[in-house]
């Protein structure tokens, strides 16, 4: 019976050894956990894409939970961004059925983003490039399909921005 207890304890110890470096708390200091995200400037040809990306960045911060959304006067971190370009490319076409021909298109956007420490006024990340990608199907009314896909594109960019905010090296 003592051998079973010993083996059980040894098994638990071995399994928990892999978790020794895991932390339940964030590396972001408590006084740096407020964020403000103004509307991103949109230099692309896709209408309202700057608004969509900024809104999705806010949602991603809320979903992740480390940062609290704040006003510009009370925030510790401000995320400023510019949607600099978008592109649309055909990926795949199927000509087997001419009555219901569908085309897959890849929608890509590039954002330039800066992270500003509002307490010190220091730019922590200066003009980092983020590329978001998504795909959609369709032949007719590509502009509407592109606009509809912009939410998924914004999710991709937002996830990258929030990941970087969580991994900032704070002084």
Language-model segment annotations:
Residues 146-171:
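Compositionally biased, intrinsically disordered linkers/stalks adjacent to structured regions
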Residues 45, 49, 103, 145, ...:
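Conserved acidic
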Residues 23, 64-68, 74-75, 80-124, ...:
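Surface-exposed short loop/turn segments
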Residues 17-59, 63-66, 71-74, 119, ...:
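A structural "domain/chain start" motif
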Residues 1-19:
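Sec-dependent bacterial lipoprotein signal peptides
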